[in-house]
Amino acid sequence: MERSGTARQPQLLGQKKDKFWLTVGLCALTAALFFLPFYIIEGGFFHYAGDFNSQQISFYRYMNGFIKGAGYPDSAFTSVHNTFSWATDLGSGVMNAYSFYLYGSPFFWFSLLFPQGWLPYLMVPLLVLKFAVAGGGAYLYLRRYVKNIDYAVLGACLYTFSGFTVYNVFFNHFVDVVALFPYLLWSLDEALYNDRRSWFAFWVAVNLVNNYFFFIGQVVFLAIYFICKLSTRDFRLTAKKFGLLAFESLLGAAMGSILLVPAMLSILQNPRTIDLSSGWGFLTYSKVQQYLAILVSWIMPPDSPYLTSIWSEGVIKWTSMSAYLPLCSLAGAVAYWKAKRGDSKKRIVGTCAVFALVPILNSAFYALNSSYYARWYYMPVLVLAAMTVNALENHNTDLDSPARGISWLMIATVAFAVVPVQDSDTGSWSFGVLKNPGQYCAVLGFGLLGLLLYRYLCQKWRSDSRFAQRMTAAVLAFAFLFSVVHIGIGKFGQWYTDSDLVKQDTNALLLKNDLPEGDYRVDTYKIHDNIGMWLDKSCLQYFGSTAAPSILSFYPALGVKRDVRSEPELSNYALRGLLSVEYLITTPEKQTDLENEADDGWEYAFAKDGYAVYRNTNYVPMGFAYDYYLTQTEYEETAKATRANLLMRALVLTDEDAAVYGKYLTHLPEGRREELYYESYVQDCRERRATAASVFQMNNSGFHAEITLEKENLVFFSVPYDDGFTAYINGQEADIVEVDEGLMAVLCPAGENSIDFVYQPDGIRLSRPLTLGGIVVWLAYTAYFVWRKRRTKRA
């Protein structure tokens, strides 16, 4: 006999129609309403804070044009097009740089229907679409677990407007994952309970292509989900069912591998992996506050991503740490937990709670990434939504006592506001350890107000036939109010720094057409992130996590921090000559600061389009030769502070490459490794400029250069090394040498040389046929089951 709250065949139970589109519409309308005030205030160009402003708007606008062929021209040497982005840091393969952000997102590809110039104004409509899609998917999943379809609508709204989703508007592309995941879980249920074929493979592929990084966590969660349901005998597992499920899993992975294989090969070169040096780091977090923050994140509305209300220690900011359900918190889920025994949902959520509290298990959702994140919470949130609506639908469940208990837990956090604190320097006493009291009061107020309204509705309307509808209305109203406040806190908290964002971005589009012609890099000074993307220029200041991995070794070797952004300080003047920076851009308001801080190598060029532009008098065109080299071992023995100066004088070769290519250069004498001053840097730039290529042309698949050499020599290009590059010298393929711990050089003969570097993502030759083959197999597989179903019906 079927137990209440377990899976069942989706039924309409005599109702006139399904409510999928109603759910989609409600979620879209609510999202549109809470974005509307900001949309109106800003004239349609919605900007938020942090990553949304610096990355998401810039990435969507830039990539819309890049895919359509705007910007750098096609290469005349090859038929390969649109594979390499010069505006991404020092230059990066576009597939690997953006597959984490948007390259596989169906929402991004949908945005290509619109002109590039529209994209900054379409960020809100696209977010509304994502919320709508999330609601539809959650409804499809949840309707299996309810008797009254209205509770599926309610559960879908709880999931769609959870604290996790609203929090991650800040990151934008995380909402894509929230939107698509319910369809994956729905398709798994369809395969397990209804023996429905092909849908699971399809949604595996879609979720994998959408975001390979989040897909790793989805695989872990699906394993937990499957095992927990199997352990409670929610479905009957046969060898045939398991075999078909395994086949569809592999088939979906094959169809989605178009981005996966290149991304994995790129990630293997990325140093942001788990630190295996600490056994305790596997099992415990280093700060007690981390545990408290995790527990509170499941019951209280979230803080703004970059502001913490309480916590002063631990990794809290930007981690997406929230599993809060709007209005209800965990009240309904706890009520369900108390009422059920041996239930699969309880086991799923319980297992996820253990994973959240153990570092090594938590990091399993991110391929053992060493950085702490909670960006997988959206998956148990969907199960929590199911538990909540099951508890609300069952009139025998005690709803009030869990709500009271959670209210008291929320109130207990007031202790952080009143605990006495003694100043270690002055000895004076004060009260409270709150970091942002105003935000804390707002979060606590919404949490308590939500539970108060939840209890009122349950007490007054629970026996009413329209209880689910009333609760849905209350949840949506609460979600609207909280989302406006949450986004407002984050947005206006940075208003003093971001109020001129739109002006700078739009002015950069004007400046793009007024900059001198040529293929060179630029630098910026005290202006907003990623302006280089609006200029379509390679820029030393870049904010993005997934640029070419070799950049993450090149910069640290120079003492320049490179985690999620590149921002070498202006004082590192030699880096500008090495990387062929010709112009530096700032605003008129910052000119005085720039001139006081900069070295003598910058001269004022012109002011236009709201910017002041300076020219680098030590500019060296890209593509030049050296007289000297030193080994990487010798290089690593030098002071990091002057290594950029050293790189203008000598090429750095690995010990192995020095044995092969050292004969074309002179080993740098020890005495010349120390004369590293500004004056000697100017002379080194002059010497490198004398050997520079006469032609250097950037294109959307790499670059073309022409150079005349007096003797056979290595020609250096300050382009990040990547296994996806193939070099051609005078039409003949040539070996690429990794130099300077992350850049490239190629050996050219004496005389005139035509050099072409062509980029295709490493692994694409494997992933492309794998994906195409997978699609062909899936179409045949689907066609077979459609044919069999029709034949059965006719029989």
Give residue ranges: language-model regions.
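Start-transfer (signal-anchor) and selected internal transmembrane alpha helices
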Residues: 1-40, 244, 452, 466-476, ...
